[in-house]
Design a protein with these regions (language model features):
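Short, contiguous strand/loop micro-motifs
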Residues: 8, 42-43, 59, 73-74, ...
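A broad structural signal for alpha-helix termini and local helix breaks/kinks
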Residues: 28, 63, 194-197
Length: 427
């Protein structure tokens, strides 16, 4: 039995995700597809537009056999930690291969970049320092240093974006690899695989359609998640029917999941953020909240802002939108740096929580129970009896975050979904 794993957000599930899932099965010849999906919050430091149970159902309807949850401590982490959790979890449950999308589409090129970043040469470190001293952001300086140190004889074959048969001795081509979000995440998967000595095979496919951050329908066949979220937000403000909106832009196979769907947006958390800022102290040890950002947050005079407005007010050249958004979300959730450090030190993947699975895929569950090296949670009410204290704390952080999400969601007309009583999603 061969199992392929996909590390995802599905925010929301769109045509590009369906293509990814289909190609992953074909490329690996896998018998089963396991999806590891962010829960209530995503890496950008925002709430998922739809709840985790709805998004689980869309994945299963599209062909996934099993959906597991990335807990909020790592679903809202940096690319490095997000990737490390995904690789650790899929390795721990016995997945054989991982397939991810990338702008590059060439696994060997991404492996070379990953190796270079895991084994930084003295020249790389010096060029990185020079870039930072010159005023570049860390991602910009890192991309430039990679380009300047990796340029040389490797060739990229049959990659449209990199021009087939282009000699990548050109440093700009190497730099561009680290300027593309899916390449960056793919490189982090490969770095984590080396660090964790993962036995899994890794494959990449060229990302189809609009770019990750494209917020318009540049490609009607493969619109980006960002564009779809924008359409939903803008259309709802004009009192358009949600199901009509979704039917035009999401795979038909997933449409049944959206009956009664209630979208959630980052500004729905504005009240919680304002209340937290009012009572916070600059000495809080909150994940991703630097002393500089904490000081700016607490500097008088206080004025209530929407979540989006506060991000815009705080971001700088060095503090990107996503970095600020992630820090503010961690502040609202009370997510402490010391807790995340402990969970990382203990191996990231302390349990595997099932969100849903296909009934016809029961042999997969039997296989995972045999191959799995960490507790497998199928019933939340029983989790406390099977988890070590640290693992239970990781799960309880997810429960707290999801209940906050649900509290906000019911204000938009949703039904509260309790983490301890909500059943698994079956298809």
């Amino acid at each position: 039995m061969k199992i392929v794993g996909l590390i995802t957000e599905y925010n929301p599930f769109h045509a590009g995700h369906l293509y990814h899932m289909q190609q992953a099965r074909e490329l690996t010849g896998a018998d089963y597809c396991v999806v590891l999906m962010s829960g209530s919050f995503v890496q950008r430091g925002e709430p998922a537009i739809f709840d985790k149970y709805l998004r689980t159902k869309t994945a299963l309807l599209a062909g996934a056999d099993l959906v597991l949850e990335i807990p909020v401590a790592f679903s809202t982490a940096s690319a490095h930690e997000f990737a490390a959790y995904g690789v650790a979890l899929l390795s721990a449950i016995g997945v054989d291969a991982v397939v991810f999308g990338s702008e590059c589409g060439q696994i060997e090129i991404l492996k070379q970049a990953a190796y270079a970043l895991n084994h930084e040469s003295a020249e790389f470190q010096e060029r990185l320092r020079k870039g930072l001293k010159a005023g570049l952001t860390y991602p910009q300086a890192r991309a430039k240093a990679l380009g300047e140190t990796q340029a040389g004889g490797t060739r990229v074959e049959n990659v449209e974006d990199f021009h087939a048969n282009t000699d990548v001795s050109n440093s700009h081509i190497w730099s561009s690899i680290l300027n593309s979000p899916n390449n960056i995440l793919g490189i982090e998967y490969l770095r984590a695989a080396e660090d964790l000595h993962s036995p899994m095979e890794f494959y990449t496919i060229s990302r189809e359609g609009s770019g990750y951050h494209e917020d318009t329908l540049a490609d009607a066949n493969f619109p980006s998640a960002s564009a779809i979220r924008g359409i939903i937000r803008n259309s709802l403000s004009k009192d358009k029917d949600l199901l009509d909106i979704l039917a035009s832009h999401l795979p038909a196979v997933t449409h049944p999941a959206y009956t009664g769907a209630v979208p959630v947006f980052v500004d729905d958390f504005s009240g919680l953020l304002n209340a937290t800022v009012l009572q916070m102290q600059a000495t809080f040890s909150i994940a991703d909240l630097s002393p500089e950002l904490a000081a700016r947050l607490t500097k008088p005079p206080y004025f209530p802002l929407s979540f989006e407005e506060r991000i815009q007010a705080l971001k700088t050249r060095q503090l990107t939108y996503t970095r600020v958004s992630r820090a503010l979300l961690h502040l609202v959730l009370g997510m402490r740096e010391e807790d995340i450090s402990r969970w990382k030190d203990e191996g990231y993947a302390l349990y595997a929580r099932i969100l849903g699975f296909r009934r016809q895929s029961s042999p997969l569950l039997s296989c995972l129970h045999k191959k799995n090296s960490i507790p497998l949670i199928t019933k939340m009410a029983d989790a406390a009896q099977s988890l070590a204290p640290s693992a239970l704390a990781l799960l309880e952080q997810e429960v707290y975050a999801s209940h906050l999400y649900q509290t906000v969601r019911i204000k938009r007309g949703g039904v509260f979904q309790n983490e301890y009583t909500e059943g698994l999603v079956f298809v």
